[in-house]
Structures are given as structure tokens and as C-alpha cells.
Amino acid sequence: MALLTFKGGIHPDDGKSLAKDKAIVEVKPKGNLVYPVSQHIGAPANPVVAVGDHVLKGQMIAEAGGFVSAPIYASVSGTVKAIAPHLNPTGGRVNSIVIENDGEYKEVEYPAVTLLEEMSKEDILNAIGTAGVVGMGGAGFPTKVKLSPKEPEKIDYIIANCAECEPYITADYRTMIETPEKLVGGMKIILRLFDNAKGIFGVEDNKPDCIEKLKELTKDEPRIEVMALKTKYPQGGERQLIYATTGRAINSTMLPADAGCVVDNVATMVSIYQAVVEGKPSMERVVTVSGDAVAEPGNFRVPFGINQQELVEAAGGFKTEPEKLISGGPMMGFSMFSLDVPVTKTSSSILGFTKDEVAKMEPSACINCGRCVEACPSRLIPSRLADYAEHHDEEKFTKHEGMECMECGSCSFVCPAKRPLKQAIGSMRKIVMANRRKKK
């Protein structure tokens, strides 16, 4: 039987061997913790503490700022030292709550947890929302909102994104290996919300051990299926995953719910389980630290707010001064100029690369080879769109579906002329979106 997949895509060296066999290690922070109030899509959270307040681990320090928002909790005990703008992983300055860690990790007394069997759908959604769970594999969309579509009866599929297709990142892989019960438990909780839905675990076939574990845990679950996907980037893209597992296609103007689907990644489903079954707020995540500049690549369970420099030190520091620092994956992540930034809800990895691993090539003229067209999972013509972008031709850019680009970088990866196709198209997309907002 042919493996499930999508059209286009590429096969970069995955680099996962550096960390895939490293068990998750818990790291306790030493210095101050910084909590940006914007760690999710939507309205920023509103601080509910003041400078000088003493807080406990698990205490809410910022409440949701609206329907599309999420609260933030202290991941250590200590004293609020400041509420002020602070550098975040994207390079911007965001209003943040700074807590001086007292090293005692005194925790709040969590309210008694209601048995899952006795919880209503509303109870489950409220538990997820109150815990501050957001999408931990992408842009950080508040999970309670995602699980509250207007017509829940039309949701046919709950898809667990277990692809982890970005090179070097192995955080989800280790989570699937070490705590698969919580992942399956998270899926079962979501299925409680959608009576007509079937659960799918979409796992790339380079993770046969995960496929085996998940099949064993779900063998008596008629509503859940484990699907092996062809290992190819960007298999973990939302559109590509939905197409591969269900055969349904969506575009940039649609939500997965429009195609009867809800997609959550591994870390998010585990957080859902912890929120509903254990009654714990979202306070930590697993982060991969890898790359050829890192002394001891590995996977680490860390509290939100920990300084990324501390996390790199937990991985033995850098054996060679890195030429490039990346937050997230090498394909869709972003470069960092400083490690003096916190781990947030959406921080999946920290990558450090030496100059030998960083491509530095001068772009030249397009040779019309068509490789970018073959690689594009959105079935676009990236070379043409990049030309329109470079000439600031918004009309032609939108006419030729430039807004359908998901900025996966496949086109730039295969381009023999080394043209910065993704960067040009991505910049133009931002301009178009900004102009559309002005017209509203």
C-alpha cells in the first residue's frame, strides 16, 4: 500500500540523529523568568500581578485579554520584579512579566479534578481554556477557540500532527516515545467534544517505533486510527496533513473546520490531557537543542519563561561559536541575534549552526528550470511570484495566488540559482496583508 502524502515537497537532510535518541531531561531555571503577555494569536494577556507580589508555581499571572486569547501562569515561585517590554525570540520587544526565581518551586493547591467521565463538553472546554493551552507547534492559536467551531457536528476528523517534519527537531518524537499514554489521552478528550468525529494520528514512516506504540495503545479504540505518512517536508503543514490523511483540500481562505477537520500537534494534545485529567495549567514544554555547534544536543523539559541561554548551557553550551542561531526549525523558523530571550509556549527548538553548515551563496538569475514549481506543495510558480514581489506588483502577485504561499521554503531549498524566493514572496505577503488591513 502506498504511503499517504501530498504533491510537491522536498527531502532535506533531517539532522535528527543528533538528538532523537536523547531522553527528555528536566531543567530547572537558575535566573529570572520572563513571560511575554503575547505568546499566542489574539489579544495579549492582561497582567493580574504587580511588581513586588510573591507568586507560587501554577498561579495565574496574566488573564486572557479576550475571547481569542489565553492566560499565563507562573512556572516557578518567586517575586515579580518588573512588568516591562523585553526582547522575545522573534527579535521584537513585548510587554513581559519578570519573576525572580526563589528556587523553592512552591506550588499552588490545584482544585480537585472532576473525573473525565463526569465532565460535560463545556467543562472540558473550560478546563482547556482556563489552563491557557494554545497550539504549541505553530502560531499559538488558543486551543479552546479551535475546539469551539460554530458547527461541531460537522467535524469528521480530529488529526494529531505527529509528523514533526522540520529537520533537527525531535521534541515531539521523544514525547511520543516516552509519554504516548498522555498523547492518546489528549486525543480521547478531544473526541469527547465531537460526537461524529474519527481520530487520526498522522505519523511519518521514519518513526516506526512511534507508529507501533500508538497502534498498541489504540487497538481497542474503534474511533482512532494510526496512519503512516511518507517522510517528506512539509508533511506537517496543516494543509498537507489534512490532504494526506483525508484527501480534503483547503486553501488560505479556509480553516480546517471548513473541511470538517481539527488539527493539533503532539505537545498540544499532551497539554490538553494535563489540563483536563491532572488539572494543571500550561507551564512547560519539551524543547530540542541541536545543531552542529551544540556540544551535547538533546531534548529538555523546561518551564515557560526560562532564559534560552540557560537551556543551551544545559546542552553543554556551544563547542564552536555558532554562525547562525535559529528558533524553531531551519526551514520555517527564524534567526535570532541573542539568546537573552525566554522560552515561550511556541518554542519548539533552539538550533546552533557553524559556518560549515550555513549556506552562503550569491544568488544569480533564474534559469527557468522549474524545480521550484515541482517542489511547491501549494502548486504555485514561486519564481514568477518572486519576480512580482521584487517589482512590487501587488496586482499580479495576488492574481497568481501569491497569498496561497505557506512560506515553507521548499522553493528556495531546491533553487540552483540560490534565489531568495521564500523571502521575497513572504515579504510581499506581509505588504498585501498590511494594505488589506488599512482598507478595512
Regions found by a protein language model. Name each.
Residues 78-80:
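Conserved hydrophobic positions within beta-strands
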Residues 177-192:
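Histidine-anchored nucleotide/phosphate-binding helix
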Residues 347-363, 373, 377-440:
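Ferredoxin-type iron-sulfur electron-transfer modules in oxidoreductases and energy-metabolism complexes
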Residues 102-132, 137, 150, 167-169, ...:
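Flanking helices and flexible, charged tails adjoining ferredoxin-like Fe-S electron-transfer domains
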